[in-house]
Each structure stands twice: as structure tokens, then as C-alpha cells.
UniProtKB/Swiss-Prot annotation:
It comes from the Bacteria. GO terms for biological process: translation. It comes from Finegoldia magna (strain ATCC 29328 / DSM 20472 / WAL 2508) (Peptostreptococcus magnus). This is Large ribosomal subunit protein uL29. Keywords: Ribonucleoprotein, Ribosomal protein.
């Protein structure tokens, strides 16, 4: 997910997306442990998405990037 797409989401949608991404990461790690994961690169991509979402949530908490 692109940063611009994430910024366009509402706070509630961000929380939902964060939970979905965490769930997806859990499933990917489980697949990796059982040897069923075909593309290990997906783990890194999902982790980066989670980091982007958390960054945007924190920016909104601190009101960074908001034009007054």
C-alpha cells in the first residue's frame, strides 16, 4: 500500500488496516514456519506497510503535517 493511499484513509480505517496487516503478517510467519510460504519477500512488504500505517497514526496524534 502506498503512503498516499494510507494518508487518505480515516482514523478508523487506519486501525482496521493495521489489524488486517498484523493478521496477515501472523499468517505469513506461520506459513514460513511450516514451509508453505512461496514468497518470503511478502513478510518484509507487510512489515513495511505496518510501519507506514503506524507512522501516519503517530503523525496524526502529534498533528504533524497538518496545514493550519
Amino acid at each position: 500500500m502506498k503512503t498516499k493511499e494510507i494518508r487518505n484513509l480515516s482514523d478508523q480505517d487506519l486501525q482496521k488496516q493495521l489489524e488486517q496487516s498484523k493478521s496477515e503478517l501472523f499468517n505469513l510467519r506461520f506459513q514460513l514456519a511450516t514451509g508453505q510460504l512461496e514468497n518470503p519477500m511478502m513478510i518484509g512488504l507487510v512489515k513495511k506497510d505496518i510501519a507506514r500505517i503506524k507512522t501516519i497514526i503517530r503523525e496524526r496524534e502529534l498533528n504533524i503535517g497538518k496545514e493550519a
